[in-house]
Amino acid sequence: MSENEIKGILGTKLGMTQIFDEENRVIPVTVVEAGPCVVSQIRTVETDGYNAIQIAYGEIDPRKVNQPLTGHFKKAGVTPRRHVTEIRMDDVSGYEVGQDVTVEIFNDIKFVDVTGTTKGKGYAGAMKRHGFAGQGAGHGNQAAHRRVGGIGAAATPGRIFKGKRMAGRMGNDRVTTQNLKVQKIDADANIILIKGAIPGNRGGIVTVKTAVKGGAHA
């Protein structure tokens, strides 16, 4: 497994706090309980067309696992887990089914990408959802202060283009925040402190992977 290989782990967002660095500056950090995960499957170019490892995370009552997944975990020789995801990589030779994946894989990593599901906001207007400025407060405005305004053109094209920014359901999207600094790792507690905010609620499931841009080892 090369030094620049993509590494990843599933975890739970516990919340935010702040710590002090070596120069006594306050650093806002997100606390993530990362792993431990277990490798439940290995995909290779020969069998699947690409290289990846499948990792499983989180406790679950075996009675709540459906039969296909029960058989999948039984074949791998691991106890059923609640969450499963794949981490694509160029070389999977350093992994084997049943191997534990812990937060220690990030010991030499400086920057990571974090993927999670953002907080759902429900149905929201265009000002909240897209940051529209709104319309004038006076000068003949008839109760349209927060409305979108004109959304069409003329007889040609005679329709509203797809993707037009309007009111609608906001949040609950899968989002990746890139190039976040790894501030500290506590291997004994399976904790990783990541500088800044990451997507999602407290208790949300996130995927932490080595940064694909900017150099994870920078």
From Swiss-Prot:
One GO cellular component, as annotated: cytosolic large ribosomal subunit
Keyword set includes Ribosomal protein: yes
InterPro entries according to UniProt: Ribosomal_uL3 (IPR000597), Ribosomal_uL3_bac/org-type (IPR019927), Ribosomal_uL3_CS (IPR019926), Transl_B-barrel_sf (IPR009000)
Pfam family, one: Ribosomal_L3
Entry GO MF terms: rRNA binding; structural constituent of ribosome
Organism domain of life: Bacteria
SUPFAM superfamilies per the UniProt record, alphabetical: Translation proteins
Record keywords: Ribonucleoprotein, Ribosomal protein, RNA-binding, rRNA-binding
UniProt GO BP: translation
Family: Belongs to the universal ribosomal protein uL3 family.
Subunit: Part of the 50S ribosomal subunit. Forms a cluster with proteins L14 and L19.
HAMAP family associated with the record: Ribosomal_uL3_B
Role: One of the primary rRNA binding proteins, it binds directly near the 3'-end of the 23S rRNA, where it nucleates assembly of the 50S subunit.
This protein's name: Large ribosomal subunit protein uL3
Organism classification: Bacteria, Bacillati, Actinomycetota, Actinomycetes, Mycobacteriales
